[in-house]
Curated annotation (Swiss-Prot):
Protein name (Swiss-Prot/TrEMBL): Wall-associated receptor kinase-like 3
Subcellular location(s) of the protein: Membrane
Entry annotated with the keyword tRNA processing: no
Membrane topology according to the record: Single-pass type I membrane protein
Function of the molecule: Serine/threonine-protein kinase that may function as a signaling receptor of extracellular matrix component.
GO BP term, pick one: cell surface receptor signaling pathway
Stretch list, region Atypical EGF-like: 283-340
Glycosylation sites: 32, 38, 68, 90, 119, 132, 212, 233, 269
Domain named Protein kinase: residues: 428-699
Disulphide bonds in the chain: 285-298, 320-331, 326-340
Residue ranges crossing the lipid bilayer per the database entry: 358-378
Tissues/organs with expression: Preferentially expressed in roots and flowers.
C-alpha cells in the first residue's frame, strides 16, 4: 500500500512539474543577464535560473530568491526561496558528469527536539516548520546525500510524509568501546542515521519517540541533514537544538526538452551514449531519468566554466593561469583546452618565422597558379564553345560527313583546328601576309610538320550558300594535278572559313609580266610552257575531273609560279562544279573585267567556253606583255582583247608583240591565231580547252611546221569588234 501511494503521488508531481516547466520554457531567457539582476548577496552566489529582482532575473517563481523580512530589509545574510520559505545556504549548477545530473541548493531545515527545554511539559519542539517541496512545477527533490539523524541517548527518530508514513532510526545508550564518541561515526551510540527511501517524499516531518531504556531520559534531537554538513563527532543534542537548523540538500532541475528554450542556449543535446562530446562542445544539455523523475539539465563542457543556462554563459578556462602548468614548456591556452609547446630558442624562432614566411609564399604561389589555371580553363572552354559554334555554322558537320563517305578523300584533305592555324600565322599577323584579294587575305606559314603552306582567310561568307561551299571544298580536295594548286584542307572553327593551300614561292604571273623585274626568266619558251601547262590544267578541270569544274576567274594574278617557274592555277573562290549533263551555270555575274566573257556578261550563263575566253586574254598578255586594262586604252574605250583583235585584223600583230620575244615571231603568231579563236564573240565557235591544249602542245613541239597565214575573217572580226566595243563602251 505504501508503494502504491508513493507511485501515485510521484506521477502527479512529475506531470505537474512538466506542465509548469513547459510553460516557463516557452520564452527563452534572453534578459537574465541584465545588469539590474543581483547575482550575489550575503556572500552567496545566485546563478540563473535563480534570481533576485524583476521577473526577467529568474526562470519562474520556484527559482525566485528574496530577503527575509525579519531582517529589516537586509539581503546580505538571509536569502530565501519564496515558494518553499527556506533560507538559502548555497546554490550550485549541475556538474559536467553523469553522476551529478542535477543542480544542488542547500537550505536550512528544521531541528526537532525533546526534553531540551527547562519546561519539559512543552513536549516536542521544532525550530522551523516541516519541509514541503511539493507543488505544481516544483523542480526540487531530496537527494541521496541526505540522512535522517537522531542524536541523544535512546532517541527514536521517525521521518514522516504528509500521510505519516514512517521511516526512522534509534540511538543506543550502551557505552561500548565500539560505540565510542570519538570514533567520528554516527553508528548507533547516542547517534543514529537512516537513508531515505528510493522513492523520496516531497514533504517530510521528523518526530521523536522515547524508548524503554531508562537511561534514555534527557535532551534528544532529530533532523534531516546533508551528510556533507553533519559533524558526526558531535553527539550532544543541545548543540543542534541551540543552532536551530540543519542543512538539507535539495536537487533541482528543469525541463529543456522544448526547442524554444534549448535552441537559444546553443547547447548540444546529449544522451548517455554520447561519445567524446567534452572535447569539442562548449555547452551541453542531456536527458536523464532519476528516481522516477525525467529531467534535462545543462552544463558547461570540459575546459569551460560558467552558467550554461544563459547564452554565452560558458566561458573558456585559461588553464595557463595555473603556475608551472607545463613545467619548462610554454603553456598555450586554446578554446576548451590548452597545449604545452616546447620553448623556442632564437635560432629556432628565426627558422620558425622563415618557415612561416615560406609557407605563406608557397600558399600565395599556389593561389596565383590556381587562379591562372582557372582563367586558362575558362578561356579554353569559351574558345572551344565558340569554335564548335563556328564549326557547325560553317558546315563542319556536313564536311565531315562528306569526307567520310567519299573513297580516299579523307586522306587527301584535312580539317585544321583554329588553334593550329592561329599558332602557325602568329594569330594572323600582318607580317605573315602574302597578298590580299577580293576574296580574302593569304598568309605564309610553316605547320608543325615543317611544311610551308599558304593560308587563305576569307573576308565574307554567305551562310545561305554554305552547303554549296562545303561541296566545292570536297570537290577541290579531290583534284590532283601538277599545274593546279593543291587544296590541303580547311578550318571551319573561325568566324569565316579558312582554306589551306600548298605554298608557291615565285608569286603570280601578272607581276612577272608587268612589274619592272630584271627577269630574264620570262623568255618566250617559258611563256609558251606556262600557256601549255595552264591549258592542260583547264582541260583537266573541264573534262577529266570527277565533275566538270568551271574556274570563272582565269587571269594572270591567279596563275602562280613555283621555284622552277612551273605554272599552277590558284584561287578557286568563285569556281563552280556542274553535273556531267549540264552545259552551263546561271549565276550572278562574277569575275574580273578585261578577262570576262562578253557573252556571259550579257546572258549570266557561264559555260566552259567562258573559261576559254579568259584563257585567250591570258595568251594575249603573254604575247604582248600588256595589261588587260590600261589607262590609255580605257580612255579610248577598248580593252586588251579589242586592241589585239584590231591589230590582227589590220595585219599589224607583229607591232604589238612584246619586244622581249620578237625573235620568236613565228611561234608567237601561231599562238596569236589561237588566241583570236579563243576570243570569238560567239562561245560555240570557240575551241574547247582540250583542243586549245592540243594546239599549244603542237606549236611548242613542232615550231618549224607552223602555218601562220591569217585567214580571211574580216567580216566576222568586224562584227566581233563592234560587239565587244559596244559592251565595254557601255
Amino acid at each position: 500500500m505504501k508503494t502504491k501511494t508513493y507511485n501515485f503521488r510521484y506521477i502527479v508531481a512529475s506531470v505537474l512539474t512538466l506542465l509548469m516547466n513547459g510553460s516557463s520554457a516557452a520564452t527563452p531567457p534572453n534578459s537574465n543577464s541584465s545588469s539590474s539582476c543581483n547575482r550575489t548577496f550575503g556572500g552567496i552566489s545566485i546563478p540563473f535560473p535563480f534570481g533576485i529582482g524583476g521577473k526577467d532575473c529568474y526562470l519562474n517563481s520556484w527559482y525566485e530568491v528574496v530577503c527575509n523580512s525579519t531582517t529589516s530589509g537586509s539581503c546580505k545574510t538571509v536569502p530565501f526561496l519564496t515558494r518553499i520559505n527556506r533560507e538559502v545556504v548555497n546554490i550550485s549548477l549541475p556538474k559536467s558528469d553523469f553522476f551529478s545530473p542535477y543542480g544542488v541548493v542547500h537550505i536550512k531545515g528544521p531541528v526537532t527536539s525533546l526534553g531540551c527545554s527547562s519546561n519539559i511539559s512543552q513536549g516536542l519542539q521544532k525550530t522551523l516548520p516541516d519541509l514541503n517541496i511539493t507543488g505544481r512545477g516544483s523542480p526540487y527533490f531530496l537527494t541521496d546525500e541526505n540522512r535522517l539523524v537522531a542524536v541523544g541517548c535512546g532517541t527514536k527518530a521517525l521521518m514522516t510524509d504528509i500521510e505519516s508514513e514512517i521511516l526512522g532510526c534509534e540511538s543506543s545508550c550502551k557505552d561500548t568501546k565500539s560505540n565510542e564518541v570519538g570514533n567520528s561515526l554516527c553508528n548507533g551510540y547516542k547517534c543514529c542515521q537512516a537513508r531515505l527511501p528510493v522513492e523520496r517524499p516531497q514533504a517530510v516531518g521528523v518526530n521523536i519517540e522515547s524508548n524503554n531504556d531508562t537511561r534514555g531520559e534527557g535532551c534528544k534531537a532529530a533532523f534531516l541533514t546533508s551528510m556533507k554538513y553533519f559533524p558526526s563527532n558531535i553527539t550532544k543534542p543541545e548543540w543542534f537544538q541551540a543552532d536551530g537548523y540543519a542543512v538539507v540538500e535539495l536537487g533541482w532541475y528543469f525541463d529543456t526538452s522544448d526547442s524554444r528554450f534549448r535552441n537559444p542556449l546553443g547547447c548540444t543535446n546529449l544522451t548517455r551514449s554520447s561519445g567524446s562530446y567534452f572535447l569539442t562542445d562548449i555547452c551541453l544539455c542531456r536527458y536523464g531519468y532519476f528516481s522516477r523523475m525525467s529531467y534535462r539539465s545543462c552544463y558547461c563542457g570540459s575546459g569551460y566554466r560558467g552558467n550554461p543556462y544563459i547564452r554565452g554563459g560558458c566561458i573558456d578556462i585559461d588553464e595557463c593561469e595555473v603556475p608551472n602548468k607545463c613545467g619548462e614548456d610554454t603553456c598555450v591556452n586554446m578554446a576548451g583546452r590548452y597545449s604545452c609547446v616546447p620553448k623556442i630558442t632564437k635560432p629556432a624562432k628565426l627558422a620558425h618565422v622563415l618557415r612561416g614566411v615560406l609557407i605563406g609564399l608557397l600558399g600565395l604561389l599556389f593561389f596565383v597558379i590556381g587562379i591562372f589555371g582557372l582563367y586558362k580553363f575558362i578561356r579554353k572552354r569559351r574558345r572551344i564553345i565558340r569554335s564548335m559554334k563556328f564549326f557547325k555554322r560553317n558546315g563542319g558537320l556536313l564536311l565531315k560527313q562528306q569526307l567520310t563517305t567519299k573513297d580516299g578523300s579523307v586522306e587527301m584533305s584535312k580539317i585544321f583546328s583554329s588553334r593550329e592555324l592561329e599558332k602557325a600565322t602568329d594569330n594572323f599577323s600582318i607580317d605573315r601576309v602574302l597578298g590580299q584579294g577580293g576574296q580574302g587575305t593569304v598568309y605564309k606559314r610553316m605547320l608543325v610538320d615543317g611544311s610551308i603552306v599558304a593560308v587563305k582567310r576569307s573576308k565574307v561568307v554567305d551562310e545561305d550558300k554554305m552547303e554549296e561551299f562545303i561541296n566545292e571544298i570536297v570537290l577541290l580536295s579531290q583534284i590532283n594535278h601538277r599545274n593546279i594548286v593543291k587544296l590541303l584542307g580547311c578550318c571551319l572553327e573561325t568566324e569565316v572559313p579558312i582554306l589551306v593551300y600548298e605554298y608557291i614561292p615565285n608569286g603570280d604571273l601578272f607581276k612577272r609580266l608587268h612589274d619592272e623585274y630584271d627577269d630574264y626568266m620570262m623568255t618566250w619558251e617559258v611563256r609558251l610552257r606556262i600557256a601549255v601547262e595552264i591549258a592542260g590544267a583547264l582541260s583537266y578541270m573541264h573534262s577529266a575531273a570527277s565533275f566538270p569544274i568551271f574556274h570563272r576567274d582565269i587571269k594572270t594574278t591567279n596563275i602562280l609560279l613555283d621555284e622552277k617557274y612551273r605554272a599552277k592555277i590558284s584561287d578557286f573562290g568563285t569556281s563552280r562544279s556542274v553535273a556531267t549533263d549540264q552545259t552551263h551555270l546561271t549565276t550572278l555575274v562574277a569575275g574580273t573585267f578585261g578577262y570576262m566573257d562578253p557573252e556571259y556578261f550579257l546572258s549570266s550563263q557561264y559555260t566552259h567556253k567562258s573559261d576559254v575566253y579568259s584563257f585567250g586574254v591570258v595568251l594575249v598578255e603573254l604575247i604582248t606583255g600588256e595589261k588587260p586594262m590600261s589607262r590609255v586604252r580605257s580612255e579610248e574605250g577598248i580593252g586588251l582583247a579589242t586592241y589585239f583583235l584590231e591589230a590582227m585584223k589590220e595585219n599589224r600583230a607583229v607591232d604589238i608583240i612584246d619586244i622581249r620575244i620578237k625573235d620568236e615571231s613565228k611561234q608567237v603568231m601561231a599562238v596569236a591565231k589561237l588566241a583570236r579563236r579563243c576570243l570569238n564573240r560567239k562561245g560555240n565557235k570557240r575551241p574547247n580547252m582540250r583542243e586549245v591544249s592540243i594546239k599549244l602542245e603542237r606549236i611548242r613541239s613542232s615550231p618549224k611546221d607552223l602555218d601562220v597565214h591569217t585567214e580571211n575573217e574580216e567580216e566576222e572580226e568586224e562584227d566581233q569588234l563592234m560587239e565587244i566595243n559596244r559592251i565595254y563602251d557601255s
